[in-house]
From Swiss-Prot:
GO terms for cellular component: actin cortical patch; endosome membrane; plasma membrane. GO terms for molecular function: actin binding; calcium ion binding. Residues 128-217, 480-569 form the EH domain. Component of the PAN1 actin cytoskeleton-regulatory complex required for the internalization of endosomes during actin-coupled endocytosis. The complex links the site of endocytosis to the cell membrane-associated actin cytoskeleton. Mediates uptake of external molecules and vacuolar degradation of plasma membrane proteins. Plays a role in the proper organization of the cell membrane-associated actin cytoskeleton and promotes its destabilization. Residues 1048-1058, 1105-1114, 1219-1231 have a biased composition (Acidic residues). PROSITE patterns: EF_HAND_2, EH, WH2. It is a peripheral membrane protein. Residues 1-86, 239-366, 386-427, 579-638, 877-935, 956-1418 are annotated as: Disordered. It comes from Debaryomyces hansenii (strain ATCC 36239 / CBS 767 / BCRC 21394 / JCM 1990 / NBRC 0083 / IGC 2968) (Yeast). Residues 1415-1432 form the WH2 domain. This is Actin cytoskeleton-regulatory complex protein PAN1.
Amino acid sequence: MYNPYQQQQAAYNPQQQQTGFAGGFNQQQQYVQPQQTGYYNPNQPPSLPNQATGFYQPQQQGMFNASSFQNQPTGFAQQPSIQPQQTGYVQTQPTGFQQPGTNSAPTVTENSELKIPSMRLSFITAADQSKFEHLFRTAVPKGEQAISGDSARDILLRSGLQPITLAEIWSLADTNKSGSLLFPEFALALHLCNLSLKGDPLPTMLPEKWSNEVKSFVDAISFSVPENPANILSNTPFASSGASSNPINNDWMAPQATGFNNSGAVPSTSFQAQPTGFGASQEMMAQRTGNPPLPQQATGFGSNNVAPLLPQRTGGGTLIPLQPQQTSNLIPAQKTGPLQPQTTGFQTQNPHQTGPGALQPQSTGFAQRMNNGPLQAQTTGFQQQTTGFQPQSTGFQPQSTGFQPQSTGFQPQQTGPLQAQPTGKPGQWGFVSTPTGGIPGMNAMEQHFLPSSQLPTNNLQNAMGGSLKTNVTWSITKQEKQIYDGVFSAWDSRNKGFIDGEVAINIFGKSGLARPDLESIWNLADTNNRGKLNKDEFAVAMHLVYRRLNGFDLPLRLPPELVPPSTKHIQDSMDTLKNSLKSGSAKSSPPVKPGKTDGKRYKNDDSNFGYVSNVRHRKKNVSNNDSSNGDEKPSHNSDLTIADLKKLVREKKILLDAVDAEDQDAAISNRQMESRNYQEIDSLKQQIRKIQSQLNDNVSSSGSIGERKQLMDKLNYLTRDKVPGLISKIHQVNKDIATSKVELFKLKLSKENPDWQPEDAEAGIVGTGVNGEVTDADRQKFKSKQLLKQRMAALTGKSHGSGNELDVKLHQEIKNTRSEGEIQSGMINDIEASIKDLEDGCAANLQVTNKEEVGTDKWENGNNLNEEVAKFVRELNSSKPKQQSSSQVNSTLSQGQPQTQPQSNNVEAGIVSPQVTGASDSSTASHEYRTPEERSAYIKAQAEKRMNERLAKLGLTRHMTSGSSSTIEQQTQNKTTSLYANSETSKNAERKLESQPEYQQQQQQQQQQQPPPPQRQQSQQEAQLQDKGTNGQPDSPRQVGQKPTEIMDNESDDDNEEYVALMKKKEEMEARERKRKLKKKQDKEARLEKLKREMEELKKKEEAGDSSDDEEPITEVASYGPSGSASKSSTTKSIEQPIVEEKTNEEQIAAPVVEADTFVPKTHDNNPFARIQNNSSTPGSNNGSKDNLFFKPEKEVKLDPKKAAAQRASQRGLGDFNDWSDEEENSSEDEGPNRAGAAQLASLLFGGMSQPVPKSSTVTPNQEFHDAEDIPHFDSQESKENNNGEYTSQPTSVIQEKPDAIDSTSEAQVKSIPVEVEAPSPDNFTPPPPPPPSNIPPLPNTSAPPPPPPPPPPMDTPPIPSSSAPPPPPPPPGAAPPLPNASVPPPPRGAPPLPGDSSLSSGTKQAPPSGGNVDIGALLGQIKTGSSLKKVDENEKRIADGAVVGRVL
């Protein structure tokens, strides 16, 4: 057989030999090359890799039909070209060998009948294994499974290796020692030859992995079932049926089709398709046992014997699902009627018989319904079902006779459940019930994976998951198995019983899963690596796809629940055979025990019982043995001589001595071990004591578990109990404040307009929303209409109802109040979030884990330990120093704070209040904590610092506990800010501090000139500052410049760091200020242009109008006299407006005592808007500050020419109306001083005295816009009034009293830095002049820059009162402040107005203290004199905007 190879050795050149077996022998390949390239043209050596890839499908096809193997080797029909060789070996195999003479090379026949499992050997590449397989098939004759020794020798000798080497390779490859090699052994031998040719040494022993793979491969070949039908039918009742089958079909299942004698070709064709699906040898047995009902039907009709029913019925319990599939195919064939004569033979049979005649009761139904053709055919189908039910439910047989007419309708219903039942007995694989509630997406699975389905993958993925995802189990449920079997049947149209890899790619590709997932699923399902899936394996793969679509991970190996029963049975059989072979042959096996062990005899094992009587079951041989043993012992002892006995005694003594010596040695070694252990224990104790002493010297800062728990409980109490309550209270207070503001504004409007009745906000609005609801658009539209009416009334000169205007004002106030409340609520929420962050940070450090708690309880307290170890732990605890409790530490810290106060050498020592310094020192001391209490104090200080930083980012500062703590804190911050903003280095700050004695002397002089009530006020302020020094310590990190732990460092470094921080903050504030001013300037310019147009129209109209309108305000002079209601209203306003700014600046020294105790300004102390306002516009920050870069107004000087023009226009009687604020809406053009009449001016002074900012003839629109530039934009009506009062009032009385002194001292005072704690004003404050009389509330400070000096006033100006006049006595409680001389222009001056001045001093000198008797004539004369002025200084124009102007006693 191999001579052609030897003859053709010389016909091939070495290059052809090398390329032909590239994976094999590298040196000498001429022995193997002709065998593999004999099919091809020698000029085409690259075709061999294509041959290797084609060897897998012939193996798969060969398992279906033997004829396909004969056609496979002929796939080289077109060998002269390269392309047919590459593709033809896979695709053109069935047409091979038809033209064998196309190539002149000798033909080599390949044994295509040889069955080699498609298993991979990991130590050989796939190309090499395919080449080895081809060589093996050509060398093995047909009908054999192994290559003989001679053939293997001839092949191996072609490698050119030494015979000794080949002998070693043979010993390693022939694992069974049979003298022949199976394919895995042959491949191993060739692989070893390759290793030897490469120069690698041969292993003396096969690696375990190689050996296991080869043995498994050999087992797979050995246990493969032969494909011969004769061998399969042998020793079975189907042998006779197989002999009579049609030889053309070549199918052993054809006898079943012959049972239908007259049925024609329809049943036979249906059976022909089924056997082709079970062509594999392993699956044919399953089909044979799975189709027993068909032979029962065929033999039941008289054409065959009953004998074949016996094995078919007993074997039908393995694969029942095929029965309903076949019956459904046979029902239309049975309806044709040829089966009627067959049923007559069963008329007399008993329907209740069992055994081989189980078909008889089913066939009795045919005798009763012979005339009904369709019913007879249906009942035959039902027979198959009942036979399938016999092994499962025997109780169904008696019911079948009575329900035969009904059961014909139940046929499709019964075939359904039968599909899931044959997968196993209850409790086995595939028989799990569906969970309650079902599993998701099963209907979508069934519809999506059918061949005709073209649905997108999104539909399938959307159907998965959901709440039912948790019901998906590892096992395959009945419902799933039915669906998967239906999908399998739909794709297996040829009934092959398998689904190939290409079809599986199309099926599983519809799932939309990634390729790695599909590869893993295929590897798990195709356990035998056959490249195809049967029905059970397909169900496993579909179930894995289903689980993956539901989001579950794929397992690394197949779980036991998903292993198919067929695979289990085969694997169990293989394991059993392997174990029997491993245990050895029959020679080494133990002798078989007597007695039968078959199932016909049951043998009880009495040894299972605990007690068995000695008398029972006593065997004779046992008694004989006992008696013989008893006789032997004395005979054996009696046979010993005395010498032997002595020898035994001596030996025993020697053994006993040896045992004693061993015991003694063991005792000595134990004592030595104990001594060493004690020494080691002592040394460890000494080390532990040393470490404990070190720990005692350096107290741990972490604190004990108990202290941490205590602090954690306190933290939880504060953050979970206190803070939420405080936050809710703050929100409630904000709501109350908003409500109170609205009510207060309503009361103000009511006082100003007694006839006005507030209307409902929604009364005049027509709602366009749902159900007539009023929407925001409706409100905006209504407001626009009202404003339009007002404008039209102003243009036409007609009077407009003031009630609507007041309602609009009220609505605007409500809206502003709501927006302000929302902003404050947002800030409070931010503070709450910051508190939450701080709580999380503290909780992370204070939380105690269970592990720490248990370890502390064990090793710190000595619990649950050995007594000796616990004693040692207590000894260590006794050496620990006693720690102070948290209360003691807090007390010591609080006591240490005043002591550390004088040690501060910081530049801010003279500026920051005592409580600030103490807090900073305490925070520094807390950095050097030695106890847990100190650590907790340090944590609190750090938390406060972080809180202050967060608030600073929001533009807020921390509150003090006392009433005016926020102003002191803010002014302290302003001091530090202005200090470092005005000085480039700390030396400049020191030079500024040197000027403090002058300032102190000035303060002393001023205090000496003050009356007693302001001194009492000053003492109260000192007491408040002292209280704040004790209560305001938690805010110290913010006040000290946010340096809680840096005092120990170099002070110059501290100053530089703080200077950088302050400069950065200054730049941010300047940027915000510039942005705000730019926006306001744009708005003002637009309003100003609009106002100018209106003024021009009004001017033209007034020039053309009659003089009757000018006489109207004169009649109102008498009605606006100094009445009681007017004085009461003015008194109320004088108390409410000035005090708001009195509290914010620290110039309260000049305020009366009665008004200092008023609680009204506290609303602005707690208002974040007020704090923002103070930072940008309070007198403490920008009143008269030439050197302050934060709030220095630079753009306001540019408006001076326009202001002068506007002033002259106002003096000529032009209107003052604009839409800048709500206060200005109260006065229309008709009410303004548009005619410059003295009576009209007086009516404005006394009639509009309840308004906070009355517009007199001395105020121009330009001036108002200029003033508004310094005012932050707020929505609150009250804040607008206060701000206008601040920024538009200019104190002039001091200038009138001592103009020269002020000019000389103002510059020096601006440069000086206040140090006194009693007057903690910013460094850019100028010292206040001598205070006005105590009964006049001081005006708030202004921030207007010095304008150019105005022209000298006319000579008819009233004389300025002398500043040396003694102040009048303080008025009684409740008295209103005296009437000021509001419109008297002061003499020219060059210095800016001083803060804290009262513009009413001149007025107070002239007005009587009791109030009420005012010289109206003199006042009107002054007003007339002022109205005739041509130009007024900018600062004097603001007199009319003062908060107390127009107030009547």
